[in-house]
């Protein structure tokens, strides 16, 4: 019999500083109306100088631990999904481990861009299946504000900083069981150049004494991203529902990657899921990449939107291309 995996606690953290659309009018050629009508975003959180991805991730982790009624010394593994790590080495996971005051855990980072949290959640499922006593901290955290060209209106209005976290284990908390029932993940590396940060790696290294170019910031082909994101998320959701014998009308909540309201609405429409069943909070946070889904999950949990008996469908799409869906049962 396969060991089941459950989310034991939810946590999130966003930086204190808020940058509104109106604030952005002062330094980029845009307006609140232009941003809102095209993206649905009203504001985003921006990390303070010196505030790092591991800082945000550790705070989200502490909240998830408190929500689960656990101390950090109960953890056995730490998985961190990020494309904006503190450093190339050591891993952000090891830095979070240290900030939680523990050591001796298996700790690693993974990069699947905006799909990172779902990839990490799938890995946590596998760990729990192999080690039923494991308690896995899954963190997704990003400081994208330092990888944005703030003169590029097509990208700088979209992204924000934040972190989300969950604790995964085989024994549900008394009175609350959020089962990670199934997942389906995919990728297509042939399309990687449509959404990327190429600078800083071995293909486009930093060269001493030379100015940092656009290669070190997020670059994307918006129209192509929209088309592929909607098609990929809708298709993977359909496949996951069919595999589990679930009709679309039996989905109680669709919680998609909070990238752009137009994409979210198009995915919901393609799946035939009414808007009142689609969770949206990007108006408050913008696109936080890998952090968007766990941040939204923690938000939904805090609003008591995950009561017993719910079928919840998570889906995401990101650079790579990567995409996927996860089925939760409460």
Swiss-Prot record:
Q: What is its EC number?
A: 2.3.1.180
According to its UniProt entry, the protein's GO biological process terms are: fatty acid biosynthetic process; secondary metabolite biosynthetic process
Catalytic reaction(s) noted = malonyl-[ACP] + acetyl-CoA + H(+) = 3-oxobutanoyl-[ACP] + CO2 + CoA
Q: What class of enzyme is it?
A: transferase
Query: Which GO CC terms are listed, alphabetically?
Result: cytoplasm
Its subcellular locations are:
Cytoplasm
**Cross-referenced Pfam families, in alphabetical order?**
ACP_syn_III, ACP_syn_III_C
Q: Which InterPro entries match?
A: ACP_syn_III_C, ACP_syn_III_N, FabH, Thiolase-like
Keywords from the UniProt entry: Acyltransferase, Cytoplasm, Fatty acid biosynthesis, Fatty acid metabolism, Lipid biosynthesis, Lipid metabolism, Multifunctional enzyme, Transferase
Q: What does the record give as its pathway?
A: Lipid metabolism; fatty acid biosynthesis
S-S pairs: none
Q: Map out region (ACP-binding) in residue numbers.
A: 258-262
Q: Which domain of life is it from?
A: Bacteria
Record-level Gene Ontology MF annotations = 3-oxoacyl-[acyl-carrier-protein] synthase activity; beta-ketoacyl-acyl-carrier-protein synthase III activity
Belongs to which family? Answer: Belongs to the thiolase-like superfamily. FabH family.
Q: Which PANTHER family match?
A: 3-OXOACYL-[ACYL-CARRIER-PROTEIN] SYNTHASE 3, BETA-KETOACYL-[ACYL-CARRIER-PROTEIN] SYNTHASE III
Q: How does it assemble?
A: Homodimer.
Tell me the function of this protein: Catalyzes the condensation reaction of fatty acid synthesis by the addition to an acyl acceptor of two carbons from malonyl-ACP. Catalyzes the first condensation reaction which initiates fatty acid synthesis and may therefore play a role in governing the total rate of fatty acid production. Possesses both acetoacetyl-ACP synthase and acetyl transacylase activities. Its substrate specificity determines the biosynthesis of branched-chain and/or straight-chain of fatty acids.
- Which NCBIfam families does its entry note? fabH, PRK09352.1
Q: What is known of its domains?
A: The last Arg residue of the ACP-binding site is essential for the weak association between ACP/AcpP and FabH.
Q: What is this protein called?
A: Beta-ketoacyl-[acyl-carrier-protein] synthase III
Organism annotation: Oleidesulfovibrio alaskensis (strain ATCC BAA-1058 / DSM 17464 / G20)
Q: What does the organism's lineage look like at the top?
A: Bacteria, Pseudomonadati, Thermodesulfobacteriota, Desulfovibrionia, Desulfovibrionales
């Amino acid at each position: 019999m396969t060991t089941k995996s459950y989310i034991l606690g939810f946590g999130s953290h966003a930086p204190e500083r808020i940058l509104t659309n109106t604030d952005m009018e002062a330094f980029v050629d845009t307006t609140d109306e232009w941003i809102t009508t095209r993206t649905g975003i009203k504001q985003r959180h921006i990390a303070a100088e010196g505030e790092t991805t591991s800082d945000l991730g550790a705070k989200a982790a502490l909240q998830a631990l408190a929500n689960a009624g656990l101390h950090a010394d109960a953890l056995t593994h730490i998985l961190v999904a990020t494309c904006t790590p503190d450093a190339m080495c050591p891993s952000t996971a090891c830095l979070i481990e240290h900030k939680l005051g523990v050591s001796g855990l298996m700790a690693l980072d993974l990069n699947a861009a905006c799909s990172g949290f779902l990839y990490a959640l799938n890995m946590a499922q596998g760990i729990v299946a192999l080690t039923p006593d494991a308690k896995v901290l899954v963190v997704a955290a990003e400081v994208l504000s330092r990888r944005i060209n703030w003169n590029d209106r097509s990208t700088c209005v979209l992204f924000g900083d934040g972190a989300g976290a969950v604790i995964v284990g085989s024994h549900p908390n008394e009175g609350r069981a959020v089962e990670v029932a199934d997942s389906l993940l995919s990728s297509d590396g042939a399309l990687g150049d449509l959404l990327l940060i190429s600078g800083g790696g071995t293909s486009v290294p930093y060269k001493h004494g030379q100015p940092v170019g656009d290669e070190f910031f997020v670059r994307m082909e918006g129209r192509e991203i929209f088309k592929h994101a909607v098609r990929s998320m809708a298709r993977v959701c359909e496949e996951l529902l069919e595999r589990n014998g679930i009709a679309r009308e039996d989905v109680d909540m669709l919680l998609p990657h909070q990238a752009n309201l137009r994409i979210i609405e198009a995915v919901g429409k393609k799946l035939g899921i009414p808007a009142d069943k689609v969770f949206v909070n990007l108006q408050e946070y913008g696109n936080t990449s890998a952090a968007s889904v766990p941040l939204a999950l923690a938000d939904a949990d805090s609003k008591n939107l995950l009561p017993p008996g719910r079928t919840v469908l998570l889906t995401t799409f990101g650079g790579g291309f990567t995409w996927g869906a996860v089925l939760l049962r409460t």
